[in-house]
Amino acid sequence: MADETFKYVILGGGVAAGYAAREFVKQGLNPGELAIISKEAVAPYERPALSKAYLFPESPARLPGFHVCVGSGGERLLPDWYKEKGIELILSTEIVEADLPAKRLRSAHGKIYNYQTLIIATGSTVIKLSDFGVQGADAKNIFYLREIDDADQLVEAIKAKENGKVVVVGGGYIGLELGAALRINNFDVSMVYPEPWCMPRLFTPEIAAFYEGYYAQKGITIIKGTVAVGFTVDTNGEVKEVKLKDGRVLEADIVVVGVGARPLTSLFKGQIVEEKGGIKTDEFFKTSVPDVYAVGDVATFPLKLYNELRRVEHVDHSRKSAEQAVKAIKASEEGKAIEEYDYLPYFYSRSFDLSWQFYGDNVGDAVLFGDNSPDSATHKFGSYWIKDGKVVGAFLESGSPEENKAIAKVARIQPSVESSDLLLKEGISFASKV
């Protein structure tokens, strides 16, 4: 089995890989210089679709419809595009060893890939209940969602268990989005999470109260303050019941788990400097190892706006960090300088007919504005966060494109504000005037 050698290798085939490939082409790439090595069987695609439109009962999203870079309004990069540009897509290939000093990767089949420059874009893997030793956690019809294969298995179960009972374990992004998707598919949905309210890392209790109330109106049962501690299975090995720590037992035809993710960095342990659970980089996504860059979920990078190191798990950062790394690689080859990465944290979600966006930092005092009652006709409300007399973060539900741009601008500029009363009174119009 002959070695293969490339000038550039992107390890990982997710969102970041696709956006990096596009940036390489934009910057100037010769055929045969770049390879993308991915354990998935398909070309890079927009992962957020899996928890949303992929699960719709009518007109669901399917590949090739959501290959990168459609998620940011760009061109859709089909497998033929990579071929035309002379980019090697090495799919269904798992790398089991990375020798960074030797600039060499080895696949599970023993094949060696050599590189001059490596971009680590390995992303994250889901945290499983079996990681905590939960009894029965390997039963059939317990699902996690990370890759398209996971989504396909869930789609099959949705068809097989039509109108059945679903228990969603977890109250974060995945839990809320999948809870909504399964309710739209006419399942009886219960959500279980240990925290006192949903999305606790971002939402205030007041923001969460709206979504919990709205979900309840849609017929979703929300059970807070407890966790799944075991599962009952039938003779086919399929899950039948979820046992909760508080003693309750829930019937379940399907269980969907969204309890977090961890960055895939184990290949590089002991070879590279790590921090905050990720691979430490500079503002150009260079790591401590020459000619090795890390982007997306795995990178712990300097967040210039707040003068601190952070690791961000979000598609927006995956796209932008990938582009920044490629620009930096090309600039260093040409002896040029580029601007430092200056990222504004951004999160969003869509479920049912709701859609929210958040920009900035959710630290300091939160000021809720608008009507956050689940019964309101408009569902229009938001929140600002004030720290040291400045607005540092902004959240908006059901905003227009102009209003969403306005809250992003506020979070970037961080205007001074004398009192929270002004924000309370003006609401979204405060952001629109900045």
Swiss-Prot record:
Catalysis performed (reactions): 2 monodehydro-L-ascorbate radical + NADH + H(+) = 2 L-ascorbate + NAD(+)
Enzyme category, top tier: oxidoreductase
Keyword line: Cytoplasm, FAD, Flavoprotein, NAD, NADP, Oxidoreductase, Redox-active center
Compartments in which it is found: Cytoplasm
E.C. number(s) listed in UniProt: 1.6.5.4
Predominant place of localization: cytoplasm
Job description of the protein: Catalyzes the conversion of monodehydroascorbate to ascorbate, oxidizing NADH in the process.
Protein name, as recorded: Monodehydroascorbate reductase, seedling isozyme
Organism: Cucumis sativus (Cucumber)
